[in-house]
């Protein structure tokens, strides 16, 4: 019996070692097969703490610059190969503290009106990527057969300019778009970006399938013809084309792009929870599927050591990532060239980012919640009804809470300050009367909750 037990132990040990070796090999394959781009400045990737810029790009090509198949675009409700415009429609900075600990993921709404890097002026932040792509494409393809024409019949013929669809041109252009976006995000947040990852349209669908679906929860059923999303209310798993539609839908949502930002956060929270709690990073078969997805849909900066990062990620628990959204002002900011945009105050964004990281990492205590206008009004009403009409205490109570008229004004100003105060203070004359955007509550990977 003892010999049998030892034999079983040996067999089990060999099996564990074999599976572990296969998993490690899959991580190495993932590291080698993923497309890379030189987009991070020298020395930025050596910091102990990590600030990772994640972009979801509305691109119709794969990381190697090849066009996505028309059948796939049709299935994704993504239009044709000429649609999309190479805009960064999902922008998230993930801060991982030195030595591990709680990570903070901060979303930047795609329509945020900010100063772009590389001299592009003030525009919506999602266009930083597309402007870098377009200008680099033009620069690489502007030559012609007549440029540098031979001076004699015996001179070699000039090579024709490459096509904008040439995979090498696309790769260079996408890298330029990434660099412009990185510099823009660094200036807005005050963080030094140490690593970069982008995923194309197919990536959300592919990743969700590779991990067996992503848990999400909807407050109400959805049937959206624009994105192709058709889901019932309540908790459920989304994968494939429905996963992409879940993070892309904004038509029919009360807060438009801000609700889409929350959708993206909930999706990533669910994916993070499933990856970490289910031990996907230690599952060789899941890693095998993920390596194929990475090759088709993901681009990383060339200096990113995926093996070390995978080891670091295994130290995180499922609930150790908090998702937040930068403070914003009005969602109806009139702009000279870009239509309506989301107003942001860069100084306030930098302060918010610093405070959020300190709170999530445990350096600072969480702030006390600010009562809403409705709560203040209810408190004032209850105070008035419980006091006599001629009591001076009622006057003091009303004054203490700020009379109902002043209270609403004061709290609204305070509330807008925490959500991007420049919006309600009238930083732009055309939008001074517009209300500030609602402040999305933080979302944790452990309990993301239901969304619109």
Task: Mark where each language-model region is.
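Non-catalytic, solvent-exposed segments at the cell envelope interface
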Residues: 1-452
